[in-house]
Amino acid sequence: FVCRHFIDRDMHKLAGLGLSYELDTSALLEQKGFCRHWTELATCNTGDSFLTELTDIEGDVVDMEAYAQAFVCTSKEIPFISVKFVSDVIGQNSVKHWEDKLADARTGLSHFFNVLKESI
């Protein structure tokens, strides 16, 4: 997944206080002319907890850090995307799957960036 839209599920709980919990980095990427050939849009849902069961969350993938990274980059006007490799399925022994899938993630992401490098 190539994510340009980010939701912080912890901040979402505070939305009634006027705090922002969603970011979309597409406009800055387009303005700078980056990633034009990536047409698929993916949403990353970020939070401080490791999810072990499926809950009502928005997004295509879940992590624990991308919203903060996107927030800092956006505030500094630095283009940001997050490339995600799905290492586990929520509710299906996620901790064990995550440990087992690290080598697969390394291989998959290496392939992704090698293909990207060749297309530039």
What residue spans do the PLM features occupy?
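Glycine-rich phosphate- or other oxyanion-binding loops that anchor nucleotides, phosphorylated ligands
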Residues: 1-120
